[in-house]
């Protein structure tokens, strides 16, 4: 299939939200948004986080229960000696499972590398479209244009308050407020299992250096994630397989993404 892609332009902002210059974006931000590919790859990558589980092979079988036999006017289920309590059988209290979960079950779903790369390109393209960003429920000022590209010096921000101030100046801090207001206690047993709160998804900051101070500075801000451009995937760009996450790019991260993914596209 032949696609004629047209390059977009974007304004680069500094830490104070002022326009510094205008640059031409690579073709990866002009690719059509393929929700079907994004969903398929998201679900495949999600399976990599699943943990195999099984049961003790002897679970429900640690009993001396045997059937009393026939012609006694009672069911022939295994019964505990000197007690008469039914045991061992799947339909009894404390009995074995008929088909227990197995650690041999194949949990990880495979997906083609080319398809995975196209999904990332498509998800990146959605972050450059205001319609998709709004459809995800993100909140931002009307003056914000997408994609949001900022100068590389933002990676030197060292405290959470500095990062929050930066987000306020570029017009996306309202999205952090939305996340804070909507954090709630999870329904169900997950509360007992280390998953007490459900937190909405907020802004994503894509940087060019994993060791930069902003990585630690932003990790305690509700809903905000910081990811290296070399590692960014559909999991980050389209949480829940819904494309259009509010994303902030550093100038160098755009170049890294272009080098990493543009070979999949023919200009």
From Swiss-Prot:
- Name the domain of life this protein comes from: Archaea
Which InterPro entries does the UniProt entry name for this protein? Ribosomal_uL4, Ribosomal_uL4_dom_sf, Ribosomal_uL4_euk/arc_CS, Ribosomal_uL4_euk/arch, Ribosomall_uL4-arc
Q: Which Gene3D superfamilies match?
A: 3.40.1370.10
Please give the Gene Ontology molecular function terms for this protein: rRNA binding; structural constituent of ribosome
This protein's record includes keyword rRNA-binding: yes
Q: Which GO terms describe its biological process?
A: translation
A GO cellular component annotated for this chain's UniProt record is: ribonucleoprotein complex
Q: Name one Pfam family in it.
A: Ribosomal_L4
Q: Which UniProt keywords apply?
A: Ribonucleoprotein, Ribosomal protein, RNA-binding, rRNA-binding
Tell me the HAMAP family matching this sequence. Ribosomal_uL4_A
Which protein family is named in the record?
Belongs to the universal ribosomal protein uL4 family.
Biological role:
One of the primary rRNA binding proteins, this protein initially binds near the 5'-end of the 23S rRNA. It is important during the early stages of 50S assembly. It makes multiple contacts with different domains of the 23S rRNA in the assembled 50S subunit and ribosome.
Oligomeric state and interaction partners are given as: Part of the 50S ribosomal subunit.
Q: What is this protein called?
A: Large ribosomal subunit protein uL4
């Amino acid at each position: 299939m032949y696609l004629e892609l047209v390059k977009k332009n974007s304004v680069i902002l500094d830490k104070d939200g002022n326009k510094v210059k205008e640059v031409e974006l690579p073709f990866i931000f002009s690719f059509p948004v393929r929700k079907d590919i994004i969903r398929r790859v998201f679900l495949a990558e999600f399976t990599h986080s699943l943990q195999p589980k099984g049961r003790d092979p002897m679970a429900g079988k640690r009993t001396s229960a045997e059937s009393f036999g026939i012609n006694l006017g009672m069911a022939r289920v295994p019964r505990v000696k000197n007690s008469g309590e039914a045991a061992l059988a799947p339909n009894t209290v404390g009995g074995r499972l008929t088909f227990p979960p197995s650690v041999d079950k194949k949990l990880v779903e495979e997906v083609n590398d080319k398809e995975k790369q196209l999904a990332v390109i498509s998800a990146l393209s959605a972050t450059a479209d205001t319609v998709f960003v709004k459809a995800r429920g993100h909140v931002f000022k009307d003056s914000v244009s997408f994609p949001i590209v900022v100068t590389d010096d933002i990676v030197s921000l060292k405290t959470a308050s500095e990062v929050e101030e930066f987000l306020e100046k570029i017009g996306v801090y309202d999205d952090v407020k939305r996340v804070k207001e909507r954090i709630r206690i999870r329904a169900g047993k997950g509360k007992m299992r280390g998953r007490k709160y459900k937190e909405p998804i907020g802004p994503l900051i894509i940087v060019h250096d994993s060791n930069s101070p902003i990585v630690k500075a932003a990790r305690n801000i509700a809903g905000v994630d910081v990811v290296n451009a070399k590692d960014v995937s559909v999991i980050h760009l389209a949480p829940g397989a819904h494309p259009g996450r509010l994303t902030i790019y550093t100038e160098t991260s755009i170049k890294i993404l272009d080098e990493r993914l543009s070979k999949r596209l023919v200009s």
